[in-house]
């Protein structure tokens, strides 16, 4: 669903080395269903060419941002259930995040334990494997950008943002606003055992909501 809202045919993240495994007998079914609208990692037979430098993500149509370096300290390790909603439909998946000062890995599993995607981001760049796309959730690349936006410090993001954009912590929320002051992404946090952890991500431009 998100591919119709993003520029360049819906590629949410550039600089991506990807391998998407789809058997030929499944492709026609995918095309007939909602999955065709969400195969945003450029499809089974046409990988997105790798670009130099760190990967970029769309913030809104016409505005991209280069992601911060993958390292984070202290290290983050979590296993969370993500529930996404779009057009009144919801879907859930289990996401396992591991990040340290050198590398970030993000794996998504279905409710029955089937791996949907695996994303690795390190000094060599971004590598993603995605076999199944869940229509009611953003693609793996967009989930990665949202995860980094919610976990990485503002000091890491601010130099990367387009001119005039702001990222601000206000109480239990983090707000990303464009140069016109419009709220683009809103992240809500909860204090758990002394740690400020994200519990929801609202993307107002691309119209999706993720509950963690």
Annotate each language-model stretch with its function:
Residues 53-78:
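Post-signal peptide N-terminal segment of mature Sec-exported envelope proteins
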Residues 127-152:
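Acidic/charged, solvent-exposed loop-and-adjacent secondary-structure segments enriched in E/D, K/R, S/T
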């Amino acid at each position: 669903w998100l591919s119709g809202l993003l520029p360049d045919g819906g590629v949410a993240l550039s600089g991506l080395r990807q391998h998407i495994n789809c058997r030929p007998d499944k492709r026609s079914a995918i095309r007939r269903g909602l999955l065709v609208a969400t195969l945003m990692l450029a499809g089974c037979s046409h990988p997105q060419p790798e670009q130099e430098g760190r990967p970029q993500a769309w913030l809104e149509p016409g505005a991209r941002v280069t992601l911060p370096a993958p390292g984070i300290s202290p290290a983050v390790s979590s296993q969370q259930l993500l529930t996404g909603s779009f057009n009144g439909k919801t879907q859930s998946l289990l996401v396992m995040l591991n990040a340290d000062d050198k590398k970030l890995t993000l794996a998504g599993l279905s409710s029955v334990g089937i791996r949907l995607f695996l994303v690795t981001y390190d000094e060599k760049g971004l590598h993603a494997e995605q076999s199944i796309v869940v229509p009611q959730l953003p693609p793996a690349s967009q989930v990665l950008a949202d995860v980094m936006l919610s976990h990485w410090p503002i000091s890491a993001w601010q130099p990367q943002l387009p001119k005039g954009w702001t990222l601000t912590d206000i109480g239990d929320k983090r707000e990303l606003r464009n140069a016109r002051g419009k709220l683009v992404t809103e992240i809500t946090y909860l204090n758990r055992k002394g740690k400020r952890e994200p519990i929801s991500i609202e993307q107002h431009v691309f119209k999706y909501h993720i509950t963690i």
